[in-house]
């Protein structure tokens, strides 16, 4: 399973670890992903999504029904 938020599309980005001696080694910054069950009142069921913390805030702000409609429009499975 890929490390990508289903709502925002955020994925890993790359950068450097930098030591005290300024040595640089490549690393990945991973998004803060969580599996979360959201109750969908209109469908009378839970929907399980893999979302970032920002994705949860988007769902809180816009509503789960609006977000699910967008996910369905782009063919996302959930």
UniProtKB/Swiss-Prot annotation:
GO CC term (a single one): cytosolic large ribosomal subunit
Region entry Disordered, spans: 1-20
A GO term for molecular function: structural constituent of ribosome
Keyword match Ribosomal protein: yes
One Pfam family it belongs to: Ribosomal_L28
GO biological process: translation
Heme found in the keyword field: no
UniProt KW keywords: Ribonucleoprotein, Ribosomal protein
Transmembrane segments: none
Domain of life: Bacteria
Classification via NCBIfam families: L28
Protein family according to the UniProt entry: Belongs to the bacterial ribosomal protein bL28 family.
HAMAP family: Ribosomal_bL28 (MF_00373)
Listed name of the protein: Large ribosomal subunit protein bL28
Organism: Pseudomonas putida (strain W619)
């Amino acid at each position: 399973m890929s490390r990508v938020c289903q709502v925002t599309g955020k994925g890993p980005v790359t950068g450097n670890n930098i030591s005290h001696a300024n040595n640089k080694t490549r690393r990945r910054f991973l998004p803060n992903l969580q599996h979360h069950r959201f109750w969908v009142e209109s469908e009378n069921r839970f929907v399980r999504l893999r979302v970032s913390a920002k994705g949860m805030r988007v769902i809180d702000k816009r509503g789960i029904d609006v977000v699910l409609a967008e996910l369905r429009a782009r063919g996302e499975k959930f």
